[in-house]
Amino acid sequence: MFTMKKPLLLLFFLGTISLSLCQEERGADEDDGEMTEEVKRGLWNTIKEAGKKFAINVLDKIRCGIAGGCKT
């Protein structure tokens, strides 16, 4: 019985160490994901603002075409 306890204890110990290492790597990956998400938000806001400016210019040109009295 004692001879089986040592290998099982060793297996448990090694499994615990590998599990803790995996959790540390997972935690490090999650931090990188937050930075990526922030960068994506910044890029999305830039695209959205450019789209708004484009839409405003197009609507102004349409309004000028209908009204007929705009400066070019």
UniProtKB/Swiss-Prot annotation:
Cellular compartments per GO CC: extracellular region
InterPro entries attached to this UniProt entry: Frog_antimicrobial_propeptide (IPR004275)
Family: Belongs to the frog skin active peptide (FSAP) family. Brevinin subfamily.
Proregion span(s): 23-39
Organism from which the protein derives: Amolops chunganensis (Chungan torrent frog)
Covalent S-S links between cysteines: C64-C70
UniProtKB keywords: Amphibian defense peptide, Antibiotic, Antimicrobial, Cleavage on pair of basic residues, Cytolysis, Disulfide bond, Fungicide, Hemolysis, Secreted, Signal
Tissue specificity of this protein: Expressed by the skin glands.
GO biological process: defense response to bacterium; defense response to fungus; killing of cells of another organism
Record protein name field: Palustrin-2CG1
Organism domain of life: Eukaryota
Function statement: Antimicrobial peptide active against a variety of Gram-positive and some Gram-negative bacterial strains. Has antifungal activity against a slime mold isolate. Has hemolytic activity against human erythrocytes.
Pfam families per the UniProt record, alphabetical: FSAP_sig_propep
Broad class of where this protein is predominantly found: secreted
Subcellular location: Secreted
Signal sequence coordinates: 1-22
